[in-house]
């Protein structure tokens, strides 16, 4: 059937029939002017979203379909007030063992989550500092299931399935390049501290965000609202250190890097970076998040054009220059 997602087929359909997989963004029972009941869906995939209606449904179907789940539908394309929408002819929930490429349905990181996770774990495996190695690998193992699918944010940078790993592995690659330069100038720079700080800096996002099986965040958790991932990350390190009986000073340095990675109090860090490794972690975090947001904002802009103002980037308009 080629591409599995449904909505990309609407505009390229050879007939007025389409079939494929999509996400239920919302579903509600409604009635038309004649009193006939129907289920009103908003369906979505990586290509966008579309209104769809299920008429003449059986009473037992009400409650069968839920938001943030994957379904397969066969539908007829109709025009309503010059907008394309779907009349659902057949519909079913996806089976647990059904192979569905989630990258065609929702925004996903461009690399396999298992491979990105292994990149982080192998990096920690090479640490000569046993305490840093144990702390980092322990926290990765304890949170692996969530780390594999969590986004890095509710909105904005890396707010996609696997986005937390994408953000973290990109930062780690950047850190290795930066440390290769500055280690020559400042031999006492601890690359292992930098790498451990980067690997764990956002790990408590797995507790801060409410994320379903699709790997997209829908809200902040109660703890996320009240404590935030910086404080929760420090607590995760504290618990791991107590379990592993790691060196108190090394544990404190790692905690400081998590505490300071947002740089300044107005962005959530109660202390600024107070040693070079913490500064590197903070600066690379800012760089990666801002570059992601800039390229995302420019993705639909023609060469020579300007983006809309980006409030997350100090309300700047961005320019697409065309040079490569």
Annotate each predicted stretch with a short phrase:
Residues 22, 68, 171, 285:
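Divalent metal-coordination and catalytic microenvironments
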Residues 40-45, 211:
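Short, acidic/hydrophobic/Gly-rich beta-strand patch recurrent on exposed beta strands
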Residues 26-37, 50-103:
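OB-fold single-stranded nucleic acid-binding module
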Residues 99-224:
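Acidic/His-rich, divalent-metal-binding segments that scaffold phosphate/diphosphate chemistry
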Residues 1-19:
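OB-fold nucleic-acid-binding modules
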Residues 156, 166, 181-301:
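Divalent metal-dependent catalytic cores for phosphoryl transfer on phosphate-bearing substrates
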Residues 282, 289, 299-300, 304-324:
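N-terminal intrinsically disordered, cationic/polar leader segments
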